[in-house]
Swiss-Prot record:
It comes from Anaeromyxobacter dehalogenans (strain 2CP-C). Pfam families: AAA_26 (PF13500). Its main location: cytoplasm. Homodimer. NCBIfam families: bioD. This is ATP-dependent dethiobiotin synthetase BioD. Belongs to the dethiobiotin synthetase family. One of its GO terms (biological process) is biotin biosynthetic process. The active site is at 37. One of its GO terms (cellular component) is cytosol. SUPFAM superfamilies: P-loop containing nucleoside triphosphate hydrolases. Catalyzes a mechanistically unusual reaction, the ATP-dependent insertion of CO2 between the N7 and N8 nitrogen atoms of 7,8-diaminopelargonic acid (DAPA, also called 7,8-diammoniononanoate) to form a ureido ring. Its EC number is 6.3.3.3.
């Protein structure tokens, strides 16, 4: 399977917008890429869900249930959200859905929920999913204070499991003036021996931000 697994150091770090930007950039370059969200939970009514955003970035070529096999109401990790509804997530079903997309498209960008060790099923985490898919992992991290620890821990967890790392992207998700931002990339590189691929700038205009992310990521990430 060709593609990427997009994980985060936390929830709310911008995984979905990075995954969407990657899909759009790949498609603009002529690569038939499609996004996938194995499980989503806690969708806010009146706003597009992560899966809907990925479907739109993918050109709307797949039905929503192919993009996202599991949807839950409660804003919880997938395993907990499934339990709350008397349901269970199957890793095998998610892998089968990803392989089905890979059979129809040249590349699949899979966006996890939360961070790497967030429980996906009653027994497996998103790290187990990344391993089962065999995709290199792109780590999306916040750019500001606290990211050094979160990013180093995520990289360590990936390395301990022998999972390939496609890179680290630091993402500014707001206009806050944080004096740690210019320093964090170098500190992460020192601790992990991995230079972050990009520091994505903050842009309040959603359309311009999407274009900016796409251009930066297209130049840095190949899959």
């Amino acid at each position: 399977m060709r593609g990427l697994f997009v994980t985060g150091t936390d929830t709310g770090v911008g995984k979905t917008e990075v995954a969407c930007a990657l899909v759009r950039a790949a498609r603009a370059a002529g690569l038939d890429a499609v996004g996938m969200k194995p499980a989503q939970s806690g969708h806010v009514a009146g706003e597009p869900s992560d899966a809907e955003r990925l479907r739109e970035a993918s050109g709307g070529v797949e039905p929503l249930e192919a993009i996202c096999p599991y949807t839950f109401a409660a804003p919880l990790a997938p395993a907990a959200a499934a339990r709350a509804e008397g349901r269970e997530v199957s890793l095998a079903r998610v892998v089968e859905a990803a392989r089905a997309l890979a059979a129809r498209h040249a590349a699949v960008v899979v966006e996890g929920a939360g961070g790497l060790l967030v429980p996906l099923t009653a027994r497996e985490t998103h790290a187990d999913l990344a391993a089962a898919l065999g995709l290199p992992v792109l780590v999306v991290a916040r750019a500001g204070l606290g990211t050094v620890n979160h990013t180093a821990l995520t990289v360590e967890a990936l390395e301990r499991r022998g999972l390939p790392i496609a890179g680290i992207v630091l993402n500014r998700t707001g206009p806050e003036d944080d004096p740690s931002v210019p320093l964090n990339a170098a500190e992460i590189a020192r601790l992990t021996h991995r230079e972050p691929l990009a520091l994505l700038p903050w842009e309040p205009d959603i359309a311009r931000r999407a274009r900016a992310l796409g251009s930066v990521l297209a130049a840095k990430i190949q899959f």
